[in-house]
Amino acid sequence: MSRVSPLKINQLTNRCSTKDLSFRTTKDLKPVRDVIGQDRAVEALKFGVEIGSEGYNLFVLGPSGYGRHSVVQNYLNRLAKTKPVPSDWCYVNNFVDSYKPLLLKLPSGTGRKLAEDMDRLVEDFRNSVPAAFENDKYRMRRQEIEHEVSEQQDKALEAVKKRAKKKNITLIQTPSGIALSPTKAGEILDQDAFRKLPEKERKKLQKDITALQADIEKIIHHIPRIRRSIQRKVKDLNQAVTRAAVSGLIEDLKQEYSAMDNVQDYLDKVQEDVVESAEELFLSKEGPGQGGGNMPTEEMQVASMVRYRVNVLVDHGEAKGTPVLYEDNPCYNNLVGRVEHISHMGTLLTDFTLIKPGMLHLANGGYLVIDAMQLLMQPFAWDSLKRCLRSREIRVESLGQSLSLVSTVSLEPEPLPLDVKVVLVGDRMLYYMLHDLDPEFSDLFKVAVDFEDHMDRSSRNVQMYARLIATLIQKDDLMPFDRGAVARVIEFSSRHAEDAEKLTMEMRSVADLLRESNYWARQGKATLVKSDHVQNAIDQAARRLGRIQTRWREETVKGTFIIETEGERVGQINALSVIQLGGHAFGHPGRITAQVRMGGGEVIDIEREVNLGG
């Protein structure tokens, strides 16, 4: 069995020759626009984004520091500019059931315009309708209707009076109502005079009084029916006046939205509700005034008019393509939205204007990027996201409603149809854990975008890597690096990859080295970063983290750690342990010993002893 040949010192590091770099400084290099060394990941990203089938959401997996977020964001931002702008979404009042607001889907940019138009329309209502109620013609007609009650009552009583007069009976108006009293020769008889009348005449008068009282009671019982009829006529009059005042305003607005059937239908419902609620909105119920009713206060009127506002949930008026959003705090409410409340007189109140969107609403029709670990750390966020993706709709409800923990009455907004690509970003362990432990995960996130840890150190890739270094330098506005400095960074990259034939794709550590090299170059009053500055940055980083390494070496020199470097010992060898603490790795020699004894002359096969070999 031949022994392994020892390595020479120059074989321990794969040096990068400056002759292989065809530039003088990084200012001569064109920045990299596309991702390098991540062909597999980019292909998967392109596939997952473009396939439109259900369940093809993406999980971007790889270690942190490899540019996962930036690669995904840059790719999606470029793609989003070529895609159409999605629709606006608004919540409006449900005039049948105000606890269940309705959705309006509108072309992009129309939502805000409709909201502004409705605000102006409401202001026009507040000006034109009260003016119509102040019209003399309306006042006269209202007074005519209200006079019908007294006229009909007076007419009926007058007929009774005539019949009573023929029978020598008169009607007397008292505080408690109408009383009947017998008369003789035009004068009212008191009880003594009535008792002195002949018995036959008394009985006839009593009979006539009883009959007349029955007639009066019929009239009194009929008065509420007359008043209800009058109230209906007044209401019809108020509605007719309101309809005449608002119909022209609404028709003008309908002309602007003639191509949108849902807006036309909504405006028709607004008109019917304004007409139906005319007295509540424009006339108080305190009693008749100069125009038949007092105007409500401005505060009351504004509060009542809220029902005609438009709550613009999603506005894409200024968008240039599909939305690409990143949620750094993916809690339950931030994902699915919420219904806010206001405190009034010690009571919590809400309405459809207090419905607030979540990131799923804002990203609908586009892309939503979420950090997977942050998502899983938020209570109920993961389950709510899966529920929305599975049902393809967003329900705005509180956690209490979702978990059936509260019984208070709240809003139940109409669910919004969901069409979004969700991109989760996390490490490999998290991806494999979700894939194995969550049965719904593989149905909802069918595309894995796996980032490479390394790229081959070929001549072509070295040139591309140099351009990538130049891109990072330009991005952070650093001083230019010469060829020697770039070569030293490439050597650092191979060492970081722990393979002389590879280059690391963890660009965070490379970018840190570039910034620190730039710092040391500026400290030396240099105008160009050279290899010495890069080496100094590497050495200084190792020094900052090298306290434990220095202490261990001191203990070895003192003899606290006993290491023999000469001769041979049975059952004992020296080894090199690699210690990694806080991002700093260093080697430390150690002694490995084993118990030994004289054997019986037989060769022991370890694999056979543990039943792994024959």
What is the predicted role of each segment?
Residues 1-614:
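Non-catalytic accessory segments flanking P-loop/AAA+ NTPase cores
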